[in-house]
């Protein structure tokens, strides 16, 4: 329950409790809080026990922690990531991005050059660069109202 509270936060909570409740009422407040936490835990355990009794003997080993989606999926997959490690290792983001930037800038990357030479002339490369039309001296460039 308090695994994610650091030492500085704990000291801050103690100082804040002393300031709010005062040193006289603080022991009584601590007792009240611990009593309330115990009652909540007892209520939770009795509810879990009632659910186990209602489910019957075939669910005797049922764990409520398995209802957490992460735990449920991890248990169902048997800690096997269904080949996700191979997919992650096979996907090289830097290489893919280099190929995309080379294609955008009109250069041919090493991998696409080797694949096109292996394929021969069967699949020609597509030039994705925009060709600029040369305008005559007195001609105005085309105007695009949506571009402004």
Swiss-Prot record:
Transmembrane helix found in the keyword field: yes
Comp. bias intervals (Basic and acidic residues): 100-110, 128-148
Sequence intervals crossing the membrane: 2-22
GO BP, sorted A to Z: protein transport by the Tat complex
Region (Disordered): 100-148
Matches recorded under InterPro entries: TatA/B/E (IPR003369), TatB (IPR018448)
Keywords: Cell membrane, Membrane, Protein transport, Translocation, Transmembrane, Transmembrane helix, Transport
Keyword Membrane: yes
Topology with respect to the bilayer: Single-pass membrane protein
GO terms for MF: protein transmembrane transporter activity
Location within or outside the cell: Cell membrane
Listed Pfam families: TatA_B_E (PF02416)
Superkingdom as given in the UniProt entry: Bacteria
Record's GO cellular component terms: TAT protein transport complex
Cited HAMAP family: TatB
Family that this chain belongs to: Belongs to the TatB family.
Subunit description: The Tat system comprises two distinct complexes: a TatABC complex, containing multiple copies of TatA, TatB and TatC subunits, and a separate TatA complex, containing only TatA subunits. Substrates initially bind to the TatABC complex, which probably triggers association of the separate TatA complex to form the active translocon.
Function as written in the Swiss-Prot or TrEMBL entry: Part of the twin-arginine translocation (Tat) system that transports large folded proteins containing a characteristic twin-arginine motif in their signal peptide across membranes. Together with TatC, TatB is part of a receptor directly interacting with Tat signal peptides. TatB may form an oligomeric binding site that transiently accommodates folded Tat precursor proteins before their translocation.
Name assigned to this protein: Sec-independent protein translocase protein TatB
